[in-house]
Swiss-Prot record:
Gene3D superfamilies: 3.40.47.10. GO terms for cellular component: cytoplasm. Homodimer. This is Beta-ketoacyl-[acyl-carrier-protein] synthase III. It comes from Staphylococcus saprophyticus subsp. saprophyticus (strain ATCC 15305 / DSM 20229 / NCIMB 8711 / NCTC 7292 / S-41). The gene is fabH.
């Protein structure tokens, strides 16, 4: 059985926040932010727009694109670090709101790697034969856990959601290989500070880790699929920082024109980052049926995940 993406949807909030916004209260500038991160703007959810609201919008699109009814979804997995509540989960809230039956629903926490982890979990459940259509959502409202007094991180984060329906696809398409991993010794470099409930990041250490692991994981995933860099049509890295992304691309040996870049529009949206990029490339006609995609992310934990897939239902 070949398992992959049967339906896709993405959602970004309406509010656009440009770099100049930060100039009034931080020692920074539009030019500096653009040069150091590649970010020009990001989207922030409104105060009354919760993580589950964004997940709902993306999910509706994914279910419609899959050509199924919501009632045909038999499991929900939501990758997020910013649930509406500690519990119930976003998946529970989403299940009720979508009108789906009493199916298995769970949130998965792997920070910015969460979408990769959740996709692979869904793949295994479908291949077991017990499930047919699993809704996987990557969503985060990072604006609510951003420390706006910290110049190094305040400028980075945005909000958004992406959703896919994972199920059986045509022969030769779908998820070809994957690589998942974690290193708990690096947990101290990126975490939610319990004192203020905001993100803390040791940028220097995270940068060194990300540059190395994104390249390694991508190369390993491609090799596991018995492919080479020349076979890759689109490289979709976690949109954390353009310099990290470029380093990973170079290590994989992918030409610049084959890398998806949406960090300039959305900033770092954690678990939503990769699906938002996929959505952008679909809109631009840069992803077509039977294209080989490499998706790779890293995040707090420290965690990482890479997936090689052949696009198409």
């Amino acid at each position: 059985m070949d398992v992959g993406i049967k339906g896709f949807g993405a959602y970004a909030p309406e509010k656009v926040v440009e770099n100049t916004y930060f100039e009034s209260f931080l020692e920074t500038s539009d030019e500096w932010i653009s040069q150091m991160t590649g970010i020009k703007e990001r989207r922030w959810a409104g105060e009354d727009e919760e993580t589950s609201d964004m997940a709902y919008q993306a999910s509706l699109k994914a279910i419609e694109d899959a050509g199924i009814e919501a009632s045909e979804i038999d499991m929900i997995i939501v990758a997020t670090s910013t649930g509406d509540f500690p519990f119930p989960t976003v998946a529970n809230i989403l299940q009720e709101r979508l009108g789906i039956g009493k199916v298995a629903s769970m949130d998965q926490l792997a920070a910015c790697s969460g979408f990769m982890y959740s996709m692979i979990n869904a793949k295994q459940f479908v291949q077991s034969g017990d499930y047919k259509n699993i809704l996987v959502v990557g969503v985060d409202k990072l604006s609510k856990i951003t420390d706006f007094t910290d110049r190094s991180t305040a400028i980075l984060f945005g909000d958004g959601a992406g959703a896919v329906v994972i199920g059986e696809v045509s022969e030769g398409r779908g998820i070809l290989s994957y690589e998942l991993g974690s290193d708990g010794s690096g947990a101290k470099h990126l975490y939610l500070n319990p004192e203020n409930g905001k993100i803390f990041m040791n940028g220097r250490e995270v940068f060194k880790f990300a540059v190395r692991i994104m390249g390694e994981a991508s190369n390993n995933a491609v090799a596991k699929a018995n492919l080479t860099a020349d076979d890759v049509d689109m490289f979709v890295p976690h949109q954390a920082n353009i310099r990290i992304m470029e380093s990973a691309r170079e290590r994989l040996g992918i030409p610049k024109e084959k890398m998806s870049v949406s960090v300039d529009r959305f900033g770092n949206t954690s678990a939503a980052s990769i699906p938002l990029s996929i959505g952008q490339e679909l809109e631009n006609g840069r992803i077509k049926d039977d294209d080989v995609l490499v998706l790779v992310g890293f995040g707090g934990g420290l965690t990482w995940g890479a997936v090689t897939l052949r696009w198409g239902k």
